[in-house]
């Protein structure tokens, strides 16, 4: 089977020509943001990974916390809300 990712379409290359360009672009933006490593609100290391729908765990300190469905927090002010204003 041929490689399904290209530089332009990224992980949505697995869909091929299906579903239309607009939907694949939206999925691409969410998946890139979802799969990157996020900053831990407890130890501030860049080691947070998504375990399940809305559940995240820091690989460094081991803390588990909840967040949004696809990424732990949308904006920086939500990150500080998790930290308790610190």
Swiss-Prot record:
Biological process annotations from GO: translation
Keywords of this entry: Metal-binding, Ribonucleoprotein, Ribosomal protein, RNA-binding, rRNA-binding, Zinc, Zinc-finger
Binding site for Zn(2+): 40, 43, 58, 61
Position of the signal peptide: none
Cofactor remark from the record: Binds 1 zinc ion per subunit.
UniProt keyword Transferase present: no
Keyword Transport among UniProt keywords: no
Cofactor dependency: Zn(2+)
UniProt GO molecular function: large ribosomal subunit rRNA binding; structural constituent of ribosome; zinc ion binding
ZnF (C4-type) ranges: 40-61
GO cellular component term, pick one: ribosome
Family note: Belongs to the eukaryotic ribosomal protein eL43 family. Putative zinc-binding subfamily.
Role of this protein: Binds to the 23S rRNA.
Assembly, per entry: Part of the 50S ribosomal subunit.
Name of this chain's protein: Large ribosomal subunit protein eL43
Lineage: Archaea, Nanobdellota, Candidatus Nanoarchaeia, Nanoarchaeales, Nanoarchaeaceae
């Amino acid at each position: 089977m041929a490689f399904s990712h290209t530089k332009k379409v990224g992980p949505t290359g697995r869909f091929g020509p299906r579903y239309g360009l607009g939907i694949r672009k939206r999925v691409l933006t969410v998946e890139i943001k979802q799969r990157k490593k996020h900053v831990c609100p407890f130890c501030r290391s860049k080691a947070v990974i998504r375990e399940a729908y809305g559940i995240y765990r820091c690989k460094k300190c081991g803390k588990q916390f909840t967040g949004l469905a696809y990424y732990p927090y949308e904006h920086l002010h939500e990150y500080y809300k998790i930290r308790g204003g610190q």
